[in-house]
Amino acid sequence: MAMNYLEAFPKELREYYKNLFGKEEANKIMKKLREPVEHYYIRVNTLKISREKLIGELKKEGLKPLRSPYLPEGLYFVREGPNFSDDFEPKLPVVVANKYAAESVYQGAMLYAPGVLKADKNIKEGDEVQIRDPKGLLVGIGIARMDYKEMTEATRGLAVEVTLPKFKLPSLSELKAFEKGYFYPQGLPSMVTARVLEPKEDDVIIDMAAAPGGKTTHIAQLLENKGEIIAIDKSKNRLRKMEENIKRLGVKNVKLVQMDARKLPDLGIKADKILLDAPCTALGVRPKLWEERTLKHIEATARYQRAFIWAAIKSLRRGGVLVYSTCTLSYEENEGNVKFMIRKGMKLEEQSIFIGSPGIGMNKVQRFYPHKHLTQGFFIAKLRKVKDI
């Protein structure tokens, strides 16, 4: 029997959420975290195509894109599902997928052999099977395309063709429109983040944790490929992936720098605008079949973030702007660190687009909640440097 949605969160995290949001809200948030986003967003790459033209292209592929009411470059698709209830018990042989593969199947992806942990020994190619995560949650039903032995031993190939996932999001990366760089799959709050930065072409702009490039390429698009954005990431592989995205999207005004962003002041640049999408506990990411992080992860990560924040503040000119964002729900990584910034000579500013909720005991910052905004859990703050410390 699979655990219910509350059991998917460590007890101390459940208590933490209850204290932070109140019991009723906390339960609603945790329930939604277990599901994929209801509205799956993509950003129209207006460097290459208009929103209306892309809608036409996608409709030709049998898709049903809808216009975002908030952003002229936003389109979204409505999630399908749930296709079966939590207590549905099909009488079928079982394939167990690892957490990552199970989360993908749960949203409509196929199951490939590397994602198979174990399987019933009587499974033959062509059999109908059920797919469960390692903790017993039913994520989908499909047809075995390998027998038991092959799917548990092979390092590549399709193990199960998924015919009935729990939920279904559109599969977009195979589309011609994707290859041509007409769009980038990106959540609504992430798009709002780049808009809140309000980039101008004569600004010195730094994106401090840039790869794989969603927000950087959005800023480039808002600048119509003018000016320059310095994009920093310490991972060579992630920067390689970012380079592919930049090329696909036709972005021309980004300079990639491989370095630890905590050492940003060593470059001696005084920026007008800095975007810091900080490394975080990712407590707001959906779907989460189960959560493993606890309070000690929250506390350690909030401390770790301060090294990036301090580097950003030192690298801003006086009067410069920092937009700070996370995909997490904790107070310490969000409002707690905004208080740290204020102590270090920063002042909170109004955001040009505000479609989330106010912060916890703090106005001008915006929070996105899974149960209220049908998005990931997300946080955005905009601050201006008013004094040097």
From Swiss-Prot:
Pfam families, per the entry: Methyltr_RsmB-F, PUA, RsmF-B_ferredox
Alphabetized UniProt keyword annotations: Methyltransferase, RNA-binding, S-adenosyl-L-methionine, Transferase
HAMAP family in alphabetical order: NSUN6
One annotated GO biological process: tRNA modification
Job description of the protein: S-adenosyl-L-methionine-dependent methyltransferase that specifically methylates the C5 position of cytosine 72 in several tRNAs. This modification appears to slightly promote the thermal stability of P.horikoshii tRNAs, but does not affect their amino acid accepting activity. Four elements in the acceptor stems of tRNAs are essential for substrate recognition by this enzyme: the target site C72, the 3'-CCA terminus, U73 or G73, and the second base pair C2:G71.
EC nos: 2.1.1.-
Amino-acid positions noted as binding S-adenosyl-L-methionine in the UniProt annotation, renumbered to this chain: 209-215, 233, 238, 260, 277, 304
Organism: Pyrococcus horikoshii (strain ATCC 700860 / DSM 12428 / JCM 9974 / NBRC 100139 / OT-3)
Protein name: tRNA (cytosine(72)-C(5))-methyltransferase
